[in-house]
Regions:
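Bacterial N-terminal signal peptides that target proteins for export
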Residues: 1-12
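Histidine/acidic-residue-rich, glycine-tolerant segments that coordinate divalent metal ions
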Residues: 93, 128-139, 145-146, 158-280, ...
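Divalent metal-coordination and catalytic microenvironments
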Residues: 55, 94, 106, 144, ...
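Metal-dependent amide/peptide-bond hydrolase catalytic core
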Residues: 26-28, 253-442
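Short, flexible, mixed-charge acidic loops at enzyme active sites
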Residues: 117-128, 219-223, 400-411
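Bacterial N-terminal signal peptides
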Residues: 10-22
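Acidic/His- and Gly-rich active-site-bordering loop/insert found
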Residues: 28-140, 149-153, 157-166
């Protein structure tokens, strides 16, 4: 996942899920159970803090999360869950049956990012791993370590209050969310065929909000995510004799600029859409015109029609650059990634009402959809009413200071300095997720 609460939020999306909610029982009143839930959370926190620091110090990249998955599997078995490992390569599924009732899925991610941590924390990651053929630092700078710890804490809290809900818990630990391929891998491995399709699903994600708060969207919460991989073919020559060759660097450079015309002149300016070229690879020396140049980039959108228009424009622009240079047609790969996460409006409404009673109205905040992407949508798209919400991580005073004119922005997800405040973040994460699950299991 990527920064959910950056300053680049766009207009609120209005699309909403059309999935019909299964018949629900009475809504949960959180007030009578809050003291018991808080006692359970306070009691588990010291041990969960140790788990958090261990996960943070030992991150693993997507589809390499063997140690991480094994640790979560061990913890869930201690609680009495039936655990199956190796779903989607390194994913795991933990099941707990507690009478007749709905099946509710709670998702966490396992993977970290290929970057160096710079938080200075005593438990900061120093881990390294192979990434794209090179050694890279690895760190949990997207908050997945907190997601996993809250996931474990929620499981423990639910079992501590199992006399107050009925049904089946389906806790899913997903690999490789950062590449938006892990959910697909689990589904391809028969996740819902082997364990049944859940009636509801929930997931949370850390964001740069004050701790003690949560953010929500009723409808599209994240963007569609696709990638581009384009290779322009030229004809190599000496740098002093450009007329003897066909310069692919010039073609690729023109494309990087011209493709933005698809955004500014072809897409409805009121609709969100982004094309970003993040990697430009060509040549080996300054005095050689290479024979090819390769571009890698990302394509983001909310609506399917905008997505299609951008794909068409990208392909047309790339072909035009090559034709203008008298070069062969470029190799164009537009790779569909994840769809936008679209929260079920009815489930969001029910859950937000509960959150406001538990946390207070001012701490449950409607937010715009993120321009970032998430493959939680792959689970939702199987016909599962779901809610994906944001969990605040920072001292409210620091957030207020950062929002003032001239204030220093706080690090957001994917920053090497991203460091949630563990205790209040964990406690709010467990409280809200436990209540959300119980609210559909009455």
């Amino acid at each position: 996942m990527h920064p959910f609460l950056s300053r680049s939020f766009c207009a609120l999306a209005t699309a909403a899920s059309l999935i019909a909610l299964p018949t629900l029982g009475a809504e949960l009143d959180p007030q009578p159970i809050k003291p018991e839930l808080q006692r359970l959370i306070d009691q588990m926190y010291p041990s969960m803090r140790s788990v958090y620091e261990d996960l943070h110090a030992n991150p693993e990249l997507g589809f390499q999360e063997t140690r991480t998955a094994a640790k979560l599997a061990t913890e869930m078995r201690k609680l009495g869950f039936e655990v199956t490992e190796g779903i989607g390569k390194t994913g795991l599924v933990a099941i707990y049956r507690n009478g007749t009732g709905p099946t509710v899925m709670v998702r966490t991610e396992l993977d970290a990012l290929p970057m160096e941590e710079k938080t200075g924390l005593p438990y900061a990651s120093k881990a390294k791993a192979q990434y794209n053929g090179k050694e890279s630092f690895v760190t949990h700078s997207c908050g997945h370590d907190m997601h996993m710890t809250s996931w474990l804490g929620t499981a423990q809290a639910l079992l501590g209050m199992k006399d107050q809900w009925k049904g089946t818990l389906m806790f899913v630990a997903q690999p490789s969310e950062e590449t938006v391929t892990g959910a697909k891998a689990m589904l391809a491995d028969g996740l819902f065929k082997k364990f049944g399709k859940p009636d509801y699903a929930f997931a949370l994600h850390t964001g740069s909000m004050p701790y003690g708060t949560v953010g929500y969207v009723a409808g599209a919460a994240t963007s569609n995510s696709d990638s581009l991989d384009i290779t322009f073919h030229g004809r190599g020559s000496h740098g002093s004799m450009p007329d003897k060759g066909i310069d692919p660097v010039l073609m690729a450079s023109r494309f990087v600029v011209d493709v933005q015309g698809v955004i500014s002149r072809e897409k409805d300016p009121m609709e969100f859409g982004v094309v970003t070229v993040g990697a430009f690879n060509a040549g080996s020396a300054g005095n050689i015109i290479p024979d090819q140049a390769r571009l890698l980039g990302t394509i983001r959108s909310y609506k399917s029609e905008v997505r299609s228009k951008m794909h068409e424009g990208i392909e047309r622009t790339a072909k035009a650059e090559a034709a203008m240079a008298g070069a062969p047609a470029p190799e164009i790969k537009l790779i569909k990634g994840s769809d936008a996460v679209v929260n079920d409006a009815a489930l969001v409404g029910r859950t937000v009402k509960l959150f406001k009673t538990a946390l207070g109205d001012k701490n449950v905040i409607p937010i715009p959809p993120a321009t970032a992407s998430e493959d939680f949508s792959d689970f939702i798209n199987q016909g599962v009413p779901s809610m994906f919400y944001i969990l605040g991580v920072y001292d409210p005073k620091k957030v207020a200071e950062a929002s003032q004119p001239g204030g220093k922005p706080l690090p957001f997800n994917h920053s090497p300095f991203f460091a949630p405040d563990p205790e209040p973040t964990f406690k709010t994460g467990v409280q809200t997720m436990t209540l959300a699950v119980m609210n559909v299991m009455q």
